[in-house]
């Protein structure tokens, strides 16, 4: 029964997880939180990760009840993500693999999300909506690849929400997206915003520019409240995501939809997706914040699948790739 230890640190979350044969044994995580109205810089984020990663490693082993000799493989996020945080975590993964004399596996971050989602929900062959701060893709598996049927042509949906949170000076604790979600629940007025869908692709830069420009004016005149703007932004961008997911499901003949990525925690997005799936006679699968948000266990799970399929990453190839496409990986562990 192989046990895989996974390191995740592609953005402002740092996690170390342990998975053994489909069971999550440990999944501790820390978040780098910045002041309201600000984002997180790669260098500062990397310093945060370096400061806590060894404590997280010990915490994961203790929680799992394992010692280094019980670990069969070390997996880490190869990309995509922010360069400095990725590199910092990769150095630790390489060092641990050499110290413990374990094989190493570089894992695609998106595939980590998908494999964890499939494990936790039991979805067999879903159309995947992958939504996070850095990525927005609609994906389906075909012929040993996770094929991208649609994606953002500019910024990710999570980035759109996070940047609007800065305009309103919304707290980044626990995350700007979560706080926008709570404010949106109190919104009562739907403000018309740009809606940009191009086939199975979406664009969020236009709606962000529009609402950034209009927010101060509309708030100053009393035309709407901050809660109304959060509600309107959520409803509009989520409608775009539901539309392209449904189009991909129709194209693939899929009866399953799986939401992964940090934005996938949003209850309103899950409600809208569930309505679409119900109307199509399909089933929606989603996870909670333990597994939607970036975590080490998802890297361990994808690493476990790859390890079982015979994958290994030679030390000389164990770098990082900031723009690591989902469909670049040959998925040999699926039929």
UniProtKB/Swiss-Prot annotation:
InterPro entries: ATPase_NBD, Gcp-like_dom, KAE1/TsaD, Kae1_archaea_euk, Peptidase_M22_CS. Keywords: Acyltransferase, Cytoplasm, Metal-binding, Nucleus, Transferase, tRNA processing. GO terms for cellular component: cytoplasm; cytosol; EKC/KEOPS complex; nucleoplasm; nucleus. One of its GO terms (molecular function) is metal ion binding. PROSITE patterns: GLYCOPROTEASE. It catalyses: L-threonylcarbamoyladenylate + adenosine(37) in tRNA = N(6)-L-threonylcarbamoyladenosine(37) in tRNA + AMP + H(+). Binds 1 divalent metal cation per subunit. Its main location: cytoplasm. The keyword Transmembrane does not apply. It comes from the Eukaryota. Substrate binds at residues 130-134, 162, 177, 181, 266. Component of the EKC/KEOPS complex composed of at least GON7, TP53RK, TPRKB, OSGEP and LAGE3; the whole complex dimerizes. Component of the EKC/KEOPS complex that is required for the formation of a threonylcarbamoyl group on adenosine at position 37 (t(6)A37) in tRNAs that read codons beginning with adenine. The complex is probably involved in the transfer of the threonylcarbamoyl moiety of threonylcarbamoyl-AMP (TC-AMP) to the N6 group of A37. OSGEP likely plays a direct catalytic role in this reaction, but requires other protein(s) of the complex to fulfill this activity. PANTHER family: TRNA N6-ADENOSINE THREONYLCARBAMOYLTRANSFERASE. Belongs to the KAE1 / TsaD family. This is tRNA N6-adenosine threonylcarbamoyltransferase. The gene is Osgep.
